[in-house]
Amino acid sequence: MEETLATPDATRRSLSPSCSATVKSRAAGFERRTKRRLSETNASVREDREEAEEEEDEVKEKIEALQRIIPGGAALGVDALFEETAGYILSLQCQIKTIKVLTSFLQRIDQEDMKFGG
């Protein structure tokens, strides 16, 4: 049984059985490659989605940690929590500077007492 194939100039030519098998084989190979590429793409999309979910979980964990650390943080939304965190950090830095100044002052007093036999 002979098959025909349309050519670009719209004429028909006969295909031998071996040529027909080659065309079918190529089509099957194309279909396998297409399925494999689609499968790889789906796997990549799945991996991207999983990575995004993991990142989102990490962010949620960090926000929860901030809510535990910042006084009153549990009652705040994310935006207010970040603002409160910034203020809290500035407050802590100010306290550290104050403690350093007081420590330095007290050390000088102790040194002066030692000079005068105190």
UniProtKB/Swiss-Prot annotation:
GO terms for cellular component: nucleus. It is found in: Nucleus. Residues 1-58 are annotated as: Disordered. GO terms for molecular function: protein homodimerization activity; transcription coregulator activity. GO terms for biological process: brassinosteroid mediated signaling pathway; developmental process; negative regulation of DNA-templated transcription; shade avoidance. InterPro entries: bHLH_AtIBH1-like (IPR044549), IBH1-like (IPR044660). Residues 13-23 have a biased composition (Polar residues). Keywords: Brassinosteroid signaling pathway, Growth regulation, Nucleus, Repressor, Transcription, Transcription regulation. Residues 43-92 form the bHLH domain. Belongs to the bHLH protein family. Atypical bHLH transcription factor that acts as a negative regulator of a variety of shade avoidance syndrome (SAS) responses, including seedling elongation and photosynthetic pigment accumulation. Acts as a direct transcriptional repressor of two auxin-responsive genes, SAUR15 and SAUR68. May function in integrating shade and hormone transcriptional networks in response to light and auxin changes. Homodimer. Plants overexpressing PAR1 are dwarf with compact rosettes and inflorescences, epinastic leaves, shorter flowering stems and siliques and a general dark-green phenotype. Plants silencing PAR1 exhibit a slight increase in the length of hypocotyls, cotyledons and primary leaves. This is Transcription factor PAR1. The gene is PAR1.
